[in-house]
Every structure is written in C-alpha cells, then in structure tokens.
C-alpha cells in the first residue's frame, strides 16, 4: 500500500471543540470532503490497469475520519469520566493519530516505535502510557530519555529493570482477568494473578519504586460486558492490596476490548461497577486528576477505527475450473480469484485478529458498480461459488475458501472490503 489514498473528514462541528490553531490547520489541510463511495470512485478513475506502471494498481484504503470522530463523541457521551488512550498498535495511520491528538486523547504505546511516532507529533509525554509489561532494557532507557513517566509491569524482573534504568517512573501493576469472553485472549501472555500481586508490591516497596495504580485488559473484542465487572472487582482487591503495602493508588486503567456493536452495554456495566467497587473515590471528569480523585483511563483501539476504513483490492488473476457434473454443487468453488493483498499484508487480521471478511464488488467489466450492483436485478442469480486468494506463493495466503461473486467478475476488476480499520494497516 503506497498510502491511504483518500479520506473523508469529521463533521463541520468538529472545529467547535477546543482545538489549537495547529490542530485545526491539520484537519483543514489533510482531509477531503465526500463519501467513502465517492472517494473510491475517484481513485479508480485515476487507475488504468492496462497502462499503469508496476504497482500502479496497488490495493488501497479509504478512511472515513468522520466515523472516528463519531466514535469519539459516543465515548464522551457514555464514559465521560474515563479518558481514552488510543491503542496505537491497532492502526498507526498518521492522520488518525493527528485527529485523536487534536481531540485530546492520550496514547497507549507498546513499543519504542509507537512512542516515537507520538512524540514526533508534538504530543506531551504525559499523554502516553507505555502499556507493555515486558520491555527490552534499551526501550526502558529510551522511555526514560523521552520523559515517558508511566508504564505497566506484571513481574519482578521488570521491577529490577525499571529500578536500574528508569527509577523515577510511575508504575501500574497489570493484573490477570477473565478474558474467555473475548475474540483475542491476552491473559495467556500478560497479567499477574491476584495471588501474585502482594509479592510484586512488596518487591516494588523494597526497591523504592512508585506504584500508582492498577491496569487490566479483558481481551480484544470483548463480547460479554460482564467481563468488565469481574475485572473491576479484581481491581478493587488489588487497590486494597496496595493500601496494605503502603501505597495510595489513584490510577486505574481499564484496558481495551470495546466493540462497536455493544459499546453502550459495556459502558453501562462499567459505570455501574465503578460505583459498586470504587464508591469512596471522587471520579475526575475527563480523566484529569483532582485531590482525592481517581484518574481512570482506557485503551480502546478497534472501537475508533474498525468501521472507518475500507480496503480496495485488484483482481490480478483468475482460474476457472473445467465444467463437470458437480457444477450444481454450490459448496465447491468454480473459480479461484487472486487479488493483490493477502494474509501477509492487511489480511493478516484473518490469522491474528480472527476477523471474518466479505468482499463487495467495486468495479466489474471496468465499470464502477459499488453499491449499485448489490441490488441490481439478476445479480444474485448470476453468482457462482469461488475462493479468494492473496498474491503470494504460500497456500496459507487464503482470504476466503468459499464465497459467492458474480460470474462476470474478471481480471482487472476491483473488490472492496469494508470494516478494515483494525489490525490491518499495522502490517503493511
């Protein structure tokens, strides 16, 4: 992917927010107005697959940044006391990062490269949490040199490392929670069981390190809102353990896992659980710290960008099976389509993020047909079973082992995949 070819901007009233002149200029100069469908058509009009240079017909994204903004407004409406720290690893597209920075979000960074990309935008280090419990020593030293003052840990060796290379850093103990109700489970790799927390806090106290709070992650793509209640119950217990070891925690990171479809249900559970388990704290509006207050952040990623990005791919080859007696069998592919992006690129989300993707026809017989063809008379009757593959020589580079596309779809035509904003661009 050369770049993200086209963007649609936030609504006009985005500039009503308290933005700096630099932020307003960024939004005004880098964005284009119009729908995703219109932008897709505009880009296709500029590509002639018969005459373009090599890579001229590369797959490309179109992003609707208005969707990112609308998701931000949903967050503010449902969870005003929790400031989102966007998970950069989910989608590091610079225009997304600039928009979220202009809206006042913090950033959840898990690597040195992610931290550098945020620092290079002029974002204050105070708006970054280094949310990786197991960091390379060189990365810890680098974080210290960049004044990144907040990070997570879940093991004693990490405490020794931080004591040696970044002793003034404020620490957040990441606890293990039940992530069995999520698409991508993270507990197998990160998170200290509650039984281990006293030992970790005792060692931190011995090393004279400043532990300020607790973090957790219910897993990416959580489909059970009650998972947050359980995690907040465990967090309450960890807070009490902190008090027993001489710490006064004032920071809580409720992680990610927020989904587009059930966000309001999750937010309702989170609000209720916070009142149940942290009734003795005064919540700080917008996540800002107030005297005797609890600063709460979260680490949403896909919530902001999943629906905002569409990916257009070009069909570079097609192989049609010889006619046989099985032609009436709709479960056997009659054709194999090869496109110019696959599981080694943006479609790594199939393998690593368990996403189910479905293509729509963007152009057919060199005519732009997106949306129009979906309900055209006779189109549904002219579909045939087929498979879709990526461009590499690896047989695992399979996008869809079985789907149905129009028989007239041919080499040079284009497909489009909607909802491709999460854990796709980060691989290209």
Predicted feature residues:
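Charged (often Lys/Glu-rich) extended helix/loop segments that serve as interaction or gating elements
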Residues: 47-50, 269, 275, 279-428
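Short acidic, glycine/serine/threonine-rich loops at helix termini
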Residues: 97, 119-120, 140-145, 162-165, ...
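Electropositive phosphate-/nucleotide-binding environments in soluble metabolic enzymes
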Residues: 62-69, 94, 109-112, 137, ...
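Structured core elements
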Residues: 106, 129, 150-152, 172-174, ...
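Active-site loop/helix belt of alpha/beta enzymes
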Residues: 2-21, 177-324, 405
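Active-site beta-loop-alpha junctions enriched in small/polar residues
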Residues: 88-93, 110-114, 133-135, 154-158, ...
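Short, solvent-exposed polar/charged micro-motifs at secondary-structure junctions
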Residues: 71-73, 94-98, 223-225, 299, ...
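A charged N-terminal "starter" segment
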Residues: 1-170, 204-206, 210, 244, ...
């Amino acid at each position: 992917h050369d770049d993200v070819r086209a963007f649609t901007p936030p609504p006009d009233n985005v500039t009503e927010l308290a933005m700096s002149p630099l932020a307003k200029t960024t939004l005004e100069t880098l964005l284009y107005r119009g729908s995703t469908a219109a932008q897709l058509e505009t880009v296709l009009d500029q590509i002639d697959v018969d005459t373009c240079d090599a890579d001229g017909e590369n797959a490309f994204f179109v992003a609707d940044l208005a969707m990112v903004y609308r998701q931000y407004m949903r967050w503010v409406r449902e969870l005003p006391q929790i400031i989102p720290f966007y998970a950069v690893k989910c989608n590091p597209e610079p225009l997304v990062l600039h928009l979220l920075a202009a809206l006042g979000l913090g950033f959840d960074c898990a690597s040195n490269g992610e931290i550098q990309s945020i620092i290079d935008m002029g974002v204050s280090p105070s708006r970054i949490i280094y949310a990786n419990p197991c960091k390379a020593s060189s990365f810890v030293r680098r974080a210290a040199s960049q004044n990144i003052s907040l990070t997570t840990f879940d093991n004693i060796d990490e405490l020794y490392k931080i004591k040696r290379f970044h002793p003034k850093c404020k620490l957040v103990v990441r606890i293990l929670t039940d992530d069995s109700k999520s698409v991508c489970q993270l507990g197998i790799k990160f998170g200290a069981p509650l039984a281990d927390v006293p030992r970790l806090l005792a060692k931190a106290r011995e090393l004279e390190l400043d532990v300020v709070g607790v973090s957790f992650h219910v897993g990416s793509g959580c489909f059970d809102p009650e998972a947050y209640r359980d995690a907040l119950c465990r967090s309450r217990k960890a807070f009490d353990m902190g008090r027993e070891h001489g710490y006064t925690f004032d920071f809580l990171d409720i992680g990610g896992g927020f989904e587009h479809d059930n966000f309001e249900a999750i937010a309702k559970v989170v609000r209720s659980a916070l009142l149940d388990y942290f009734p003795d704290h005064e919540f700080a509006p917008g996540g800002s710290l107030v005297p005797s207050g609890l600063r709460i952040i979260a680490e949403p990623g896909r919530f902001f960008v999943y629906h905002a990005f569409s990916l257009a791919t070009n069909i570079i080859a097609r192989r049609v099976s010889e006619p046989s007696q099985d032609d009436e069998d709709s479960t056997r592919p009659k054709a194999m389509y090869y496109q110019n992006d696959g599981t080694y690129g943006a479609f790594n989300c199939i393998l690593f993020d368990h996403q189910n993707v479905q293509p729509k026809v963007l152009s057919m017989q060199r005519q732009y047909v997106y949306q129009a063809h979906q309900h055209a008379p006779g189109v549904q009757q002219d579909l045939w079973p087929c498979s879709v593959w990526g461009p590499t020589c690896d047989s695992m580079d399979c996008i869809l082992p079985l789907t149905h596309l129009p028989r007239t779809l041919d080499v040079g035509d284009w497909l489009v995949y909607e909802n491709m904003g999460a854990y796709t661009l980060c691989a290209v």
